Each structure stands twice: as C-alpha cells, then as structure tokens.
Design a protein with these regions (language model features):
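Conserved catalytic-core helix/loop/strand module for nucleotide-ribose chemistry
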Residues: 1-216
Length: 216
C-alpha cells in the first residue's frame, strides 16, 4: 500500500500545496456561471480558505460549473510532475517489484511514479505490470496489478477522472462493493501487507483494516 509519503519523497507537492496551486489556476478560468460562483464564495474563502475541506469542495464545485470538465484533471497533471520525479525510496520499491516480492500494489496516489521508475530503471521487460484505475480494467489481467484506487493522472497521455473532494471520497468508501474496496479487502485478508508513506490517520483505511480483522 503506497501513500502520499512515497510521492513526496520525489518532490511531489503536498495535498495542501496541490490544492493551493489549483485554486490559483481556477481563479483564471472564465465563464459567466463560474464568475458568479467565485464572487459569491469569495467571502467564505477569505474566512476559511486555508482549510483543505473548503478548498476541495470549492474546486469540485467550480470545475462542475466550467464548460470543459477534463480541465480539472489536466490542471492536476500540470502541478504534479517536475523534471526529476524519482527518489531512493521509489527506486528501491521498483527493485522490490522487479524481484517479484509482491503480488500486487495498491496506491492512493494519482501519479504514475512507480511505473515511471520501473521504466526508467529498464525493468519494463522483467516486470509485466498493468495500471488499473477502473473496474473494467481488472478482468483478465495476468500481470502485476498496480491499483490506483483514487484514479490515475499519468505524466504523459490522457488523464483519468480522480477522487478529489471529500464528498467523492466518502461516497466511494460508503459503497461496500465498489471495486476499490473489494480489492483492498482482498489484499488485507489474503496477503501480508506493507504500508509505505502512509500516516494511518485516514479513518476509511482504518475501517478497512478493522473489517479485514473481523473477516479473518
């Protein structure tokens, strides 16, 4: 299980820094409905603008009012990556995967840094992996699955829809048979799991751990 600490080891922005960067970009977007929303919400942002929850909900609403819905993921893609997205931690994780020491990888991060490091270290031929971010992609794969349970925004190529706001996050985790919950519980109940870059403060992750304990 990979968390934000893995990505931040490679100079990825923290969650708060990402939100603040996106806030600046959204302020530059223009259309009449969005402009009206920004004017109405300006006071709330002045009072509570440093709250991750408020910023996340503001961004979700603002993008829903914009004509081009894919712009949100494209903005995240712009802010995620720099010229040197690697670290000793990521390279070591890639080598562990190379030696077939893991059955699957579950990541909560939007980025594809693990895949990039596998490719950059010349391990693509020895590690046949599949990046999975949708239910339909699970069926029939005979490769190492890398599950992006909150969506994936690769450095290059088309961007995915991601779980960004707290509202979307809670909605997904309240759906017991959502593919991401099923895959996480499968790993927690049938495999020895290692958690890297996670603070374990996420209540939904702790809930899954409690559920796995009961199931075992």
């Amino acid at each position: 299980f990979l968390g934000a600490g893995v990505s931040m080891s490679a100079n990825m922005p923290s969650w708060k820094d990402l939100l603040k960067g996106l806030m600046g970009e959204v302020k530059q977007l223009k259309n009449p409905t969005l402009d009206a929303f920004k004017e109405l919400s300006s006071h709330v942002l002045e009072e509570c603008g440093d709250s991750n929850l408020i910023m996340g909900r503001y961004l979700q609403t603002a993008i829903s009012l914009y004509d081009n819905k894919s712009v949100f993921s494209e903005l995240i893609q712009k802010y995620l990556y720099n010229d040197n997205n690697t670290s000793p931690l990521l390279m070591n994780l890639a080598r562990i995967v190379q030696h077939k020491k893991v059955n699957e990888v579950i990541t909560y991060n939007f980025d594809d840094l693990l895949e990039q490091n596998l490719n950059n270290l010349g391990l693509r031929d020895s590690v046949d992996y599949t990046s999975i971010s949708k239910d339909a992609e699970i069926k029939g794969h005979n490769t190492l699955p890398i599950y992006h349970v909150h969506g994936i925004i690769p450095k290059e190529g088309p961007v995915d829809t991601v779980v960004f706001s707290e509202e979307e996050y809670h909605k997904r985790y309240s759906t017991a048979y959502h593919w991401s919950n099923v895959e996480q519980l499968h790993a927690l109940t049938r495999m020895h799991c290692f958690f890297v870059g996670l603070s374990m403060t996420d209540p939904n992750l702790r809930r899954l751990l409690d559920a796995a304990k009961v199931m075992n």
